[in-house]
Curated annotation (Swiss-Prot):
The modification N-methylproline is found at residue 2. Glycans are attached at residue 110. Core component of nucleosome. Nucleosomes wrap and compact DNA into chromatin, limiting DNA accessibility to the cellular machineries which require DNA as a template. Histones thereby play a central role in transcription regulation, DNA repair, DNA replication and chromosomal stability. DNA accessibility is regulated via a complex set of post-translational modifications of histones, also called histone code, and nucleosome remodeling. It comes from Drosophila sechellia (Fruit fly). Keywords: Chromosome, DNA-binding, Glycoprotein, Isopeptide bond, Methylation, Nucleosome core, Nucleus, Ubl conjugation. Residues 1-31 are annotated as: Disordered. This is Histone H2B. The keyword DNA-binding applies. The nucleosome is a histone octamer containing two molecules each of H2A, H2B, H3 and H4 assembled in one H3-H4 heterotetramer and two H2A-H2B heterodimers. The octamer wraps approximately 147 bp of DNA. CDD domains: HFD_H2B. One of its GO terms (cellular component) is nucleosome. One of its GO terms (molecular function) is protein heterodimerization activity.
Length: 123
């Protein structure tokens, strides 16, 4: 038979239980968007035995965000100059050619074209 508790002790136990259930609700964490998993996948393709520190990953993430922002801004400017309201792959391609130097631009354009072709063929 369980030991009997006094009326006050039972009330206190009940209150404690209520407090736990009130404060027990988990706060929903806001997701941090990052290119970390994609940067890591590319790193492993290029150098399978190499790791990356969290600080280096943060720098790479900032770099990718910066480049994408620059490309988007340049593509927007190009669309505005040509009185267009839509940014197409053509504007993106031209923006890349304007922003990236020489051989890097050629490689970026060819990889981008390949990605767009793969995407449209999979539909």
């Amino acid at each position: 038979m369980p030991p009997k508790t006094s009326g006050k002790a039972a009330k206190k136990a009940g209150k404690a239980q209520k407090n736990i259930t009130k404060n027990d609700k988990k706060k929903k964490r806001k997701r941090k968007e990052s290119y970390a998993i994609y940067i890591y996948k590319v790193l492993k393709q290029v150098h399978p035995d190499t790791g990356i520190s969290s600080k280096a990953m943060s720098i790479m993430n900032s770099f990718v965000n910066d480049i994408f922002e620059r490309i988007a801004a340049e593509a927007s400017r190009l669309a505005h100059y040509n009185k267009r309201s839509t940014i197409t792959s053509r504007e993106i391609q031209t923006a890349v050619r304007l922003l990236l130097p020489g051989e890097l631009a050629k490689h970026a354009v060819s990889e981008g074209t390949k990605a767009v072709t793969k995407y449209t063929s999979s539909k």
